[in-house]
């Protein structure tokens, strides 16, 4: 089938169905996901001429891909909960703000560095669930805390959760990690600076951002180059 604007829109529709139902109608993920799956099957059958055999094959492939991803997710969550039960996560979260009395730097340490660390070892909402309450405890209002925690770890998603997203990317595209890793690593490395700058802006305003800009550049460089080195050396 020829690829054009219509086929592109049709292929995008199942994703839009899920987003509209979750964001617009406040459906839960399971209901919205089921509706998106039904939409995908109907579109494949009615518009892309996919027969029962092809649809069954794609569903089986999707299940196998999901099991591969779930294996990584369960391992990552086991690692996080083990560290959490040992008190390591709470200890890190409480100790980091003691390094500085500067409000903006405290926001960076918890909302950017600590949240990124949590994304790397756990992910799946853990950075926000852990970092946001710590930020509120430091005196930030709840909106600031959630925004900093959500944005601060955004750059680390691809290689976070023990590289779950990156493994999924390889599985779905069929491309080798050696080909995908360099470009994704440096693009996300640049995003690390942006995430840090936004967290500093939310925490301390423009003055806080300008005052903490050297720290953002130094810490962002350490994280970005470390991620790139690990990615290109296949440590995912």
Q: What is the role of each PLM region?
A:
Residues 1-7, 26-32, 56-67, 178-186, ...:
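Interfacial loop-to-helix junctions that mark the boundaries of transmembrane helices
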Residues 1-7, 94-102, 117-119, 207-217:
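Short, amphipathic, aromatic/basic-enriched membrane-interface segments that mark the entry/exit
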Residues 201, 221-236:
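Transmembrane helix-loop junctions at the membrane interface of multipass transporters and ion channels
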